[in-house]
Regions:
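A generic secondary-structure micro-motif detector
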Residues: 35, 95, 117-118
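Conserved glycine-rich acetyl-CoA-binding loop
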Residues: 89-103, 112, 123-130, 134-135
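A general structural signal for short secondary-structure boundary/capping elements
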Residues: 48-53, 105, 114-119, 130-132
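C-terminal "cap" of GNAT-fold acetyltransferases
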Residues: 115-118, 122-126, 134-158
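Tryptophan-centered motif/residue detector
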Residues: 108-109, 137
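Acetyl-CoA-dependent GNAT
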Residues: 3-85, 89-91, 102-104, 108, ...
Length: 158
């Protein structure tokens, strides 16, 4: 299995929207609110691709699109990166790819000077929660901005 991590090419923007839409459904079990969520997404991606510290990555396995990452090496908390999206297409879930994706995030954030990563995950996304708990992520607190999600943290290996 040859895994390649490549910065998102905006010419492949439809892959970004497809990934975000499926991730939204995995998180919440419905598409209600997705149109509002995705509004302005292309502009945000373009802006962030040009901004240091942002990582918008497409994952390919043996040349086939397998998933998408969105994360940054800064947050309001010192030495802390924030993960906005870890997405794998359904046919790559359970394939052993997810731990390698986490290793990529950890390596990238560590090189950027982060000691910790934080993400917000839906309480109903049981598959993601199971993975996070098995791979070192710890519950931090409820997300005050979203009733259905909680913050988890991962201390990065140094």
């Amino acid at each position: 299995m040859e895994i390649t991590f490549q910065q998102i090419n905006i010419d492949n923007f439809e892959l970004c929207v497809t990934a975000r839409k499926d991730a939204y459904f995995c998180s919440f079990g419905h598409y209600d609110g997705f149109d509002d969520f995705i509004s302005g997404y292309r502009e945000r991606v373009l802006d962030r691709l040009a901004t240091s510290g942002w990582f918008y990555i497409h994952i390919f396995v043996d040349g086939q699109f397998a998933g998408q990452l969105e994360f940054r090496s800064f947050s309001p908390e010192p030495e802390t990166g924030y993960v906005h999206l870890i997405y794998l297409k359904p046919n790559f879930r359970g394939s052993g790819l997810a731990p390698k994706v986490q290793d990529y995030i950890v390596s990238t954030l560590s090189k950027a000077g982060c000691l910790r990563a934080v993400l917000s995950v839906s309480r109903t996304n049981h598959r993601a929660l199971t993975f996070y708990k098995r791979h070192g992520w710890e519950f931090v607190r409820n997300n005050p901005k979203h009733d259905e999600t909680d913050f988890y943290q991962l201390w990065l290996r140094t």
